[in-house]
């Protein structure tokens, strides 16, 4: 069995969500009230407890989707880690892609849940994006190298 570990720093994840929310706040603001959406969408330090809950939901949704591969999950204070146990036929070259998609999935899922509270019109777009990343992760994990004849 091949073992890989997917990790994301909560502070890095929350920074990405904050940047995305701020960007959406600026872009969605009406011309006559430029700060209204920005103030409503901005992530502040007081939102950490909510973001912790949303990021835990994201990790647990991932685990549910790929449960046949999951060896362990750690919802730590600073880092979320999902340990996977994969078939020996798993192509290790895909690990970089899986890791990148994991980080993107976590950010998209938390952003979607954040937007559900602050800008519901954009939530489904971000949830669809998180599902796309989730499907790419599953596709890479379940991809197998074709058998090779030893010569």
Label each PLM-derived region with a short phrase.
Residues 119-128:
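Short conserved catalytic/interaction loops centered on acidic-Pro-aromatic/His motifs
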Residues 3, 99, 112-114, 131:
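Generic N-terminal initiation segments characterized by hydrophobic and/or small/turn-forming residues
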């Amino acid at each position: 069995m091949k073992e890989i570990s997917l990790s994301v720093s909560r502070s890095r994840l929350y920074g990405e969500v904050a940047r995305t929310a701020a960007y959406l706040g600026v872009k969605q603001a009406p011309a006559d009230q430029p700060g209204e959406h920005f103030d409503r969408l901005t992530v502040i330090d007081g939102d950490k407890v909510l973001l912790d809950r949303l990021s835990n939901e994201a990790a647990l949704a991932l685990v549910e989707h790929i449960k046949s591969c999951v060896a362990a999950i750690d919802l730590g204070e600073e880092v979320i880690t999902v340990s996977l146990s994969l078939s020996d036929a798993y192509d290790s070259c895909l690990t970089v892609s899986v890791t990148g998609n994991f980080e993107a999935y976590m950010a998209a899922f938390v952003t979607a849940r954040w937007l559900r509270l602050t800008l519901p019109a954009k939530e489904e777009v971000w949830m669809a994006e998180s599902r796309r990343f989730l499907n790419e992760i599953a596709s890479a994990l379940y991809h197998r190298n074709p058998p090779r004849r030893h010569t």
